């Protein structure tokens, strides 16, 4: 009878110590997570002393606005038949001969 009560005490002590270790472990994770979140808030983009030159203009623009186009076409549009004259390329020409990929 006495041996049985010793086992219960050991088992109870083991269970409470394991539960205590687990509670301390999860509290430690919680504290470090909160510390990480609060320290990352210090380095938010609006808190940097100076932005890189390329990123400066990008961050000033609202996220829903598209960037302005820098290329504008003001000349006359070319007709379809004039394109072949400009590039001097016949699109229907099929090159024949040995295939260089198959030796």
Curated annotation (Swiss-Prot):
Alphabetically ordered keywords of this record: Developmental protein, Differentiation, Glycoprotein, Hydroxylation, Secreted, Signal
Bias kind Basic and acidic residues: ranges: 76-93
InterPro entries: CLE_plant (IPR033249)
A single GO cellular-component term on record: apoplast
Any one GO BP annotation for this protein: cell-cell signaling involved in cell fate commitment
Transmembrane segments: none
Signal peptide: 1-21
Keyword 4Fe-4S: no
Modified positions (Hydroxyproline) in chain numbering: 98
Glycosylation sites: 98
UniProt record similarity statement: Belongs to the CLV3/ESR signal peptide family.
Protein name as it appears in the record: CLAVATA3/ESR (CLE)-related protein 16
Higher taxonomy: Eukaryota, Viridiplantae, Streptophyta, Embryophyta, Tracheophyta
Gene that encodes it: CLE16
């Amino acid at each position: 009878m006495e041996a049985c009560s010793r086992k219960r005490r050991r088992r109870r002590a083991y269970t409470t110590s394991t539960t205590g270790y687990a509670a301390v472990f999860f509290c430690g994770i919680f504290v470090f997570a909160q510390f990480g979140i609060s320290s990352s808030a210090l380095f938010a983009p609006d808190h940097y002393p100076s932005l890189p030159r390329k990123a400066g203009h990008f961050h000033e623009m609202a996220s829903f606005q598209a960037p302005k186009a820098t290329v504008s076409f003001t000349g006359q549009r070319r007709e379809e038949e004039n394109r072949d004259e400009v590039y001097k390329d016949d699109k229907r020409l099929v090159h024949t001969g040995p295939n260089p990929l198959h030796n």
